[in-house]
Amino acid sequence: MTESEQIVYISCIEEVRYSFVSHLSKALQRKGVNDVFIDSDDSLSNESQSMVERARVSVMILPGNRTVSLDKLVKVLDCQKNKDQVVVPVLYGVRSSETEWLSALDSKGFSSVHHSRKECSDSQLVKETVRDVYEKLFYMERIGIYSKLLEIEKMINKQPLDIRCVGIWGMPGIGKTTLAKAVFDQMSGEFDAHCFIEDYTKAIQEKGVYCLLEEQFLKENAGASGTVTKLSLLRDRLNNKRVLVVLDDVRSPLVVESFLGGFDWFGPKSLIIITSKDKSVFRLCRVNQIYEVQGLNEKEALQLFSLCASIDDMAEQNLHEVSMKVIKYANGHPLALNLYGRELMGKKRPPEMEIAFLKLKECPPAIFVDAIKSSYDTLNDREKNIFLDIACFFQGENVDYVMQLLEGCGFFPHVGIDVLVEKSLVTISENRVRMHNLIQDVGRQIINRETRQTKRRSRLWEPCSIKYLLEDKEQNENEEQKTTFERAQVPEEIEGMFLDTSNLSFDIKHVAFDNMLNLRLFKIYSSNPEVHHVNNFLKGSLSSLPNVLRLLHWENYPLQFLPQNFDPIHLVEINMPYSQLKKLWGGTKDLEMLKTIRLCHSQQLVDIDDLLKAQNLEVVDLQGCTRLQSFPATGQLLHLRVVNLSGCTEIKSFPEIPPNIETLNLQGTGIIELPLSIVKPNYRELLNLLAEIPGLSGVSNLEQSDLKPLTSLMKISTSYQNPGKLSCLELNDCSRLRSLPNMVNLELLKALDLSGCSELETIQGFPRNLKELYLVGTAVRQVPQLPQSLEFFNAHGCVSLKSIRLDFKKLPVHYTFSNCFDLSPQVVNDFLVQAMANVIAKHIPRERHVTGFSQKTVQRSSRDSQQELNKTLAFSFCAPSHANQNSKLDLQPGSSSMTRLDPSWRNTLVGFAMLVQVAFSEGYCDDTDFGISCVCKWKNKEGHSHRREINLHCWALGKAVERDHTFVFFDVNMRPDTDEGNDPDIWADLVVFEFFPVNKQRKPLNDSCTVTRCGVRLITAVNCNTSIENISPVLSLDPMEVSGNEDEEVLRVRYAGLQEIYKALFLYIAGLFNDEDVGLVAPLIANIIDMDVSYGLKVLAYRSLIRVSSNGEIVMHYLLRQMGKEILHTESKKTDKLVDNIQSSMIATKEIEITRSKSRRKNNKEKRVVCVVDRGSRSSDLWVWRKYGQKPIKSSPYPRSYYRCASSKGCFARKQVERSRTDPNVSVITYISEHNHPFPTLRNTLAGSTRSSSSKCSDVTTSASSTVSQDKEGPDKSHLPSSPASPPYAAMVVKEEDMEQWDNMEFDVDVEEDTFIPELFPEDTFADMDKLEENSQTMFLSRRSSGGNMEAQGKNSSDDREVNLPSKILNR
């Protein structure tokens, strides 16, 4: 960004020019924005107009009491539209009621408007505005910085609250300074003093230590002036202060020590941040926390490059391919993307941009060259040679291969490569040496500079230059002489030469290498994998090769021998595939340093006895040497590790094996007799091999036998005595092998592969330390006892397998029984039960089995165990799906499963068991691997969304699947770990699991297979020994509020997966029977719906649609109830009879009266009758009632009213009236005890009471009208006389004081009872209770009948009575 682009234009009125705006300007300058232009004039002057046009960001201070200059506003908006200028509006002094500015800004698309508010001070408004301006001004520099900022803040916060030190490390231009500035801007306000010294090494060289200290600390922070004479003065002033110091681009630890003095003179909680491209700086400064800055990802890189190159959306499509080449070359390097983007700006056609980019690659940016050259100059000669060799020849090569060659050159690469890594010049990734493309080009430019200065080049890699040196000019004397390469090149100076002959064809002259006395590395190859030979030819012979050669790599070497005068005393590797060699050389040569011989597909080779002189030989690769008849006895080659003789068809016998050999490949040889440890040759066409392999003689140190099929092998001998060091045994595709002996003596055997042994029926026993077992496609019916060490078991396609012995302590971590159709479901269940116990035992400390996860217990867990825990799943399993499996495992239809986790489970939480059923299309055969991707989504209590995705690998490619399969995965990585800083409440909320099949590239397999059912189980230390189908899924839906469209959609998906009969049950509960007792609801619904209600409730509970409380009540979350009612309302227009029935039931005017008689109620307790009525259809019970009290109810803002019968003096009947907790439109009346007198007469009815039939126990109406209330037992009234069973009622004489005592006792007991009622739905609110009590002294319950809407009102207000008039009498 140029200087003019950093201008910030501020438009304001004069009243705020020296108040708010001055603070804003000063804050911007503190952030490094020095070009701030403030315009407070009413009119737009020429200078103001110029600044508006040049500014990158315009801040418009819009007042509430004055108008703004329309000229300035129009000009700013015009620049925003035509020049991509950023406008930041600030409403200052605008009251909330003044919405004109907000409406106008909203219409213009301003999504971010800063507004002064009563609760927001001016300082806070300044802070918000500055942050917004800064981010918009330096937008490109901020790309990709946020995620890095979070990571480094987390690293800082983990350090103890002493003086904290953090290093930021990375290659030049990767963004170290930008990240340090972001941290400084973010955290500087938390410190008493702070300073950021950019390019620290240069600053301290120019100003000196004392001047720099005075400039950064004393003048600004302590208010002192003058020269620092005593360092102790500064230390005293900063001793107890929290100080933030950022030293950028430090190249030497000594200058840090002189400036900071060991960091010990700052106050506690101070923070020192050092950025450097040299990791050794941090080590010498004792900075242990080091953050390595990575490059931008592809999306961020494309975004930055498009901005810098000014590529709009239309041009992006045309230039996308070229842009991706630039991005791939830059490899996420921000500085390179910025520089290349600006250089390529204006190139609108792909060919034009590509040509310009190729020119830029030839000459890297000077700023980057200087930075790399400065690091290069600090290296010693050996390290420089290593750097140049990697830049020219070894980019992306195996690190061991590079180490071996450079070690042979005497460069001590084990030390040198570490130095290059610390200086950010190379990296080691996936065991390969990596160098950024820019650094590689700079390294090669250093070589080219040598040519310009001395006319000499030490390393050659350009094909045209090498061709000019090697080509036989006599054969091409008529060709035009090449001028691209200097003829003054001195062959004696050449140390390395790598020639790619993919597009070349020429003749190499006879004396091409005579003068190359220092040539260490020589390689002729073809980079085109489709070309199997190199187009170069030698006419006659080759006179010589340099004796200092360490690497001789010559593909398709055309001669039968190497030059006789070549002395390979320094040779480390011979790699000559597809050569015409018959023998390496005649006579005896000293091969002391030779470690690798690769002569693959040298079909003329007949003798290899020369390798016996290579005492340090490690690798021999003679694959495809079809004329080679013998392999020498290599027993004395103590370092030999790898021998590959595959395809050597003329080799009939194999000699003594070296003691330390690790890998032996005899595939396709003619060997007919081998020890068991070598196993078999691979020659599919050879049918007369021995049917029995003899014992293990002389092979005690063989560690791996990587051999392919021996189709005629029928039996393995048991006569061996010495098991040796055999660690891997592969017998795959031995189609005639029928049995396998007991191999318990092979104690070091770790892997056994019997895949493809289609006739194998019997296995006697396995080695006790076996870790991997493959029985794919065998005919085994019963697997013997598995070893306790087994971790991986694959029995895919074992169609005859019926049982597996389960008398073992633990199971493999991963095992597959796909296409094992005869395997019983009980065996599958036993495996799952045992696997859960393994998870508990392996991943939970012993104390947690009883006491749960205490903090001390977690702290006692070893760090290594936790790291191992995060690497893999705890358990995975695959088997064919069975018909009755869905009901046992309770898999819900669909590919998603929703659960809610109770916070109390965290103490015993182990992980999750995820069960997925996958349907495969007919003829499915996977050729890209198969796995299942699990996406887990959740929200915490604050409503923040989280997401985690894990990919569960199921099997390798080539597996044909014939029917549906069930996959089970136990994941222990998802459990919260407070030691790692995770939010402990994160798993207390709604969690959604989504599953879909993927291939090896994690792309969905939509057409060939689909997830049909799934389920999730919570595994705790409590249920670890429980059968998988008896483990309840995570149920609790009510502990906290659920909200959001995403959650509602998940609930609807869960409902949609139900069968129709269970949908009906769900809707009845949502509309009618929430908070009701299961024993009451089950028989009632059974009369309405022909179903097993108990099982249906269990189905809904498993799907987390309801919960059955400890006292037997059905509980449904309010969001689910609301969803059910919406479904009824939405479906009401359809002809579905079920929906019509439920809809009509919810608005019906009939009354439900249900007599509850619980078996647990004692005989001396009064019966209760509950009447539930709709507020729009109130009912009558014929009696006259007097209100004697009311009290608040926990979990409800409204009271409960208490009434006693006033129809007859001395009656014990009582009732309670309250609002339903689930539906505010429903009133709940609870009758306690029975009346001891006849019904009122008609005369009394006219005076305030009515006559009717007894309401003791009304018939249950099958068409329910509304939700039934909670069932509560009445208080113990054993001291009272019992009510008569039926009229006529006996007259009783009761004293008035006894009645009052009874009322008070009932009220007190009820208060105590409600004190312990749990708050199930704190979010539910009831309607105004005053609407229920329409008169302060009289309560009327009315109802609406089908014939019309009629209400009855009681007129007796003098005695505090409530008159209930039934609709039957009113309808008369």
UniProtKB/Swiss-Prot annotation:
UniProt-listed Gene3D superfamilies: Helical domain of apoptotic protease-activating factors (1.10.8.430), P-loop containing nucleotide triphosphate hydrolases (3.40.50.300), Ribonuclease Inhibitor (3.80.10.10), Toll/interleukin-1 receptor homology (TIR) domain (3.40.50.10140), WRKY domain (2.20.25.80)
Binding-site positions, ATP: G170, M171, P172, G173, I174, G175, K176, T177
DNA-binding residue intervals: 1174-1240
UniProt xrefs under SMART domains: WRKY
Domain NB-ARC: 166-417
TIR domain boundaries: 2-137
GO molecular function: ADP binding; ATP binding; DNA-binding transcription factor activity; sequence-specific DNA binding
Motif range (Nuclear localization signal): 950-964
Domain notes: The TIR domain is a signaling domain involved in cell death induction. It is involved in heterodimerization of RPS4B with RRS1B, but other domains also contribute to the interaction.
Subunit details: Interacts with RPS4B. RPS4B-RRS1B heterodimer interacts with the bacterial effectors AvrRps4 and PopP2.
Designated name of the protein: Disease resistance protein RRS1B
Lineage per the UniProt record: Eukaryota, Viridiplantae, Streptophyta, Embryophyta, Tracheophyta
